Amino acid sequence: MQHLDKLVAQVLESINTATDVATLETLKVEFFGKKGHFTQLMQGLRDIPAEQRPAVGQKINDAKQIAQNALNQKKEALENTELNEKLAKESIDVSLPGRKSALGGLHPVSITIDRVVKFFSELGFTVANGPEIESDYYNFDALNIPTHHPARADHDTFWFDAQRLLRTQTSGVQIRTMQTTQPPIRIVAPGRVYRNDYDQTHTPMFHQIELLYIDKKANFTELKGLIHDFLKAFFEEDLQVRFRPSFFPFTEPSAEVDVMRQNGKWLEVLGCGMVHPNVLRNVGIDPEEYSGFAVGMGVERLTMLRYNVTDLRAFFENDLRFLKQFR
């Protein structure tokens, strides 16, 4: 067994002097592999008397276990050292300025919708939505728009067939709401609408927001006050506002609203009026008991006026140089 003691001493010395994991792998093969020293010792047990084999085999296994434990401990220590060295080389100096994260932002049209909805929501109006593919009843008939009205023509409206179309206004939301809700009613209805038009100030798809207020004794004075307050809050300045008599089939009386800009010119911003009695009758509301007013505004137009944008098409071109200005 003197040879076994020398072998263990040799293994331990080789392990202690190893400087990397690769050297340990070589030692593992040399001492513990299929042709390694410990394997040969176990194979040599057949050459000794049978009665001595258990004791000798036990000593060989004990010696092998000592050497194996030493190798495992050394390997773990070297791996930890290598890992620490690698981490030290790859460490990040947290005092250095980092890379600036690119943040997204809301589209200017979305910003305007949020501003308008927030203003009226604070006054008790609830948001209402409706389908963009609409029937001619909700888009025209129920709104007191006669069959010969030019808005029904193909050059103004996208028709699917004789009765279905892409809505040209969000007014259908008002009809659907009045059919299912008892007065008093206060809704704000934002959404996409479609008209067959495309130039510097018109696009085939644009956004519209409509208001509807139905209650007993609703009147034009309330409507004017509401619009004054809204325009002052939206443009964040004390604007001159004027109401011009106009005509809409679904309101009577009707008006278009202009604001005085800094260049001294009047600019139209929205349309409004008292809900026509025929519209109330179409949804089963008694116009002798209830009255109401409606407001309609183009979101892109409001956005253009607020941010001094001259070409409506810029909102749909997805040019980041343009969109980044609204963050």
Swiss-Prot record:
Query: Where does the source fall among the domains of life?
Result: Bacteria
Give the subcellular location: Cytoplasm
Q: Which reaction does it catalyse?
A: tRNA(Phe) + L-phenylalanine + ATP = L-phenylalanyl-tRNA(Phe) + AMP + diphosphate + H(+)
Task: Name one molecular function that GO assigns to this entry.
Answer: tRNA binding
Residues binding Mg(2+) are E252
> What are the names of the required cofactors?
Mg(2+)
* Classification via Pfam families: Phe_tRNA-synt_N (PF02912), tRNA-synt_2d (PF01409)
Report keywords, A-Z. Aminoacyl-tRNA synthetase, ATP-binding, Cytoplasm, Ligase, Magnesium, Metal-binding, Nucleotide-binding, Protein biosynthesis
> Does the record bear Protein biosynthesis in its keywords?
yes
Q: Does the keyword Methyltransferase apply?
A: no
Return the CDD domains for the record: PheRS_alpha_core (cd00496)
What Gene3D superfamilies does the annotation carry? Bira Bifunctional Protein, Domain 2 (3.30.930.10)
Matching entries from InterPro entries are given as: aa-tRNA-synth_II (IPR006195), aa-tRNA-synth_II/BPL/LPL (IPR045864), Phe-tRNA-synth_IIc_asu (IPR004529), Phe-tRNA_ligase_II_N (IPR004188), Phe_tRNA_ligase_alpha1_bac (IPR022911), Phenylalanyl-tRNA_Synthase (IPR002319), tRNA-bd_arm (IPR010978)
The record's remark on the cofactor is: Binds 2 magnesium ions per tetramer.
Give the CC-aspect GO terms: cytoplasm
Example GO BP: phenylalanyl-tRNA aminoacylation
The EC designation for this entry is 6.1.1.20
Oligomeric and partner information: Tetramer of two alpha and two beta subunits.
Family of this protein: Belongs to the class-II aminoacyl-tRNA synthetase family. Phe-tRNA synthetase alpha subunit type 1 subfamily.
Q: Kindly provide the name given to this protein in its UniProt entry.
A: Phenylalanine--tRNA ligase alpha subunit
Q: Which organism is it from?
A: Haemophilus ducreyi (strain 35000HP / ATCC 700724)
In the record, what lineage is assigned to the organism producing the protein? Bacteria, Pseudomonadati, Pseudomonadota, Gammaproteobacteria, Pasteurellales
